[in-house]
Each structure stands twice: as structure tokens, then as C-alpha cells.
């Protein structure tokens, strides 16, 4: 069993990675292999709405997205983690989400997998961003575990998120619930 977390922050080792590591640690404690993938520094291009994916069931854009998709398809659980930039998910995570068009719909590549969002905000936009990611998980057929609250944490400067006790606890519980659901589905 494996869980992969995809971090859409352009800042390495910032608050989004801190909260993601925290959730992954909770998952790993339950005996599930974990991996974190940083989108920062990868070649992630935006969807051009060319329509090729509807005809040929593949995307003609050649970049690092396909390696990430392979990891996502092989995983039992997928987490998307993003900071809030101007009231929304980062363009990195949004580009990845948009590029799954050829994997959605009738293909249902991710149906039956476990998934959910982790969101970090300085002040506002976290609920919209959380919902934005949740809708994507629903669209692709993921099962989403709950937590003690929305999977939202607060922090601006690097490390601030660790001061958000409720956010850290929520991420931990999300990790535990993710592991529980993966195990139940694999039983």
C-alpha cells in the first residue's frame, strides 16, 4: 500500500511541505509507504484545451506530468497540497489538475482510490481552495476521508504552520483516516 502527496508550492520546505510531512508521518505510522512529490522545479505545462485527449485518450503535451500521473495511478491514496495564492490553489497544482482531463470521465483511472486536499493559508481563501481541490477529487472518483475539521492550516513565514495546533492536529487526523480507509478498501 502506498500514499503519494503532491505539493504545489513553489517554495521548498515551506509551510505546505511541513503540513504534508505531518500527514504523511501519520499515514506511515500505519504501515503504509509514503512519498512526497514537489511540483516546484518540474516541467508542468498548462492544458491548452486542444481536445486531443477526448479523441486519443492521451495528452500530446510532453512534460513531467506523465511521471506524476504514473505515480498517482500506482498509489492507493493521493493527497494534493497547496498554499493559497490570491484566493486559490497555486498555478502548479491547478495545471496538474487540469491535465487529468484524459484520465477522467469514462476512463475512471482514479475511481476507488483514496484522496484529499491539504491547504495552507496566511489569512483567507482557504475554504474556496479546499473546495476547489475536493471537487477535483469527487470528479475523478476518489473516496475522501474526513478529519476533525477541514484540512486547512494557517501560516505565513516558514514554520508558522507548526504554531497552528488545530491545523496540525487536523492534518494528523486526516493522515490517520486516510490510512484507515486505504486499509479497509484493500481488505
Regions found by a protein language model. Give the residues of each.
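Helix-loop-strand module that forms the ligand-binding subsite of alpha/beta enzymes
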Residues: 60-143, 149
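N-terminal beta1-alpha1 ligand-phosphate binding loop
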Residues: 1-32
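Glycine-rich phosphate/pyrophosphate-binding loop and the adjoining helix
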Residues: 1, 29, 67, 138-187
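Cysteine-cluster motifs in flexible loop/terminal segments that predominantly coordinate metals
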Residues: 42-72
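Short amphipathic alpha-helical segment that frequently serves as the phosphate-/nucleotide-binding helix
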Residues: 17-21, 130, 168
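A short beta-strand-loop structural module common to alpha/beta enzyme folds
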Residues: 32-42
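Conserved beta-strand segments of alpha/beta enzyme cores
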Residues: 33-35, 58, 143
